[in-house]
Amino acid sequence: DEVKNIVGAFYQPKMVFIDPETLHTLPRRHYINGLMEALKAGLIYDASLFALFEHGDIEKDLDTIIEKALYVKKSVVEQDEREQGLRKILNFGHTIGHAIESYYHLSEYLHGECVALGMLYFIEDEQLKQRVISVYERLGIPTHVDFDPEAVYQLLCRDKKADGDHVTIVHVPKAGTAELIETPLDEVRTILKGTQA
């Protein structure tokens, strides 16, 4: 069964090796796909990182984007190694994103594309959402995909983040900030049925 994120574990790396030059060996779609995690980091924690996507030159700013995204993850994980609270903000876009990815059998859309779609559901400020959509369009990230909302909901219920009849959803009220909101799964079902990203 092609389902994402049903188990997890915590292991810290012994070292991290970063070679931005290897990214240039990727097809453009995969290169941009990988940058969606950095865009997410900007939306949840560092508005200046989001600004690089919105106003900067991604090729020219790549080293800065990587450095800022790593700082976000390092800072968050150091404060909450076992995902008891703050670290959950790193899941922004992933709850619905993993379900969309599973719906398409982990093949038609890439992980970063699905996370990007998942983020759109919980950006509260409509102007910010439009700014994010503009970034997606410029980079070639899908802003909408067709799916059966009930099937995606059922996949979401199998995610390890779902707890009984609730799931912790990451909301972004403004660039650089995130809030964790315990949300009834039925409310997520309504969101999926009422509006697709």
What are these regions (language model features)?
Residues 1-54:
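A glycine/threonine-rich phosphate-anchoring loop and its flanking beta-alpha core
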Residues 7-11, 81-82, 161-163:
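Solvent-exposed alpha-helices and their adjacent loops that cap or buttress functional pockets
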Residues 14, 89, 168-169:
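Residue-level marker of motif borders
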Residues 36, 130-197:
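C-terminal charged capping/lid subdomain of soluble metabolic enzymes
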Residues 43-50, 104-107, 125-131, 164, ...:
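Short helix-capping/linker segments at secondary-structure and domain boundaries
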Residues 51-151:
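Active-site segments that bind and position negatively charged phosphate/pyrophosphate groups
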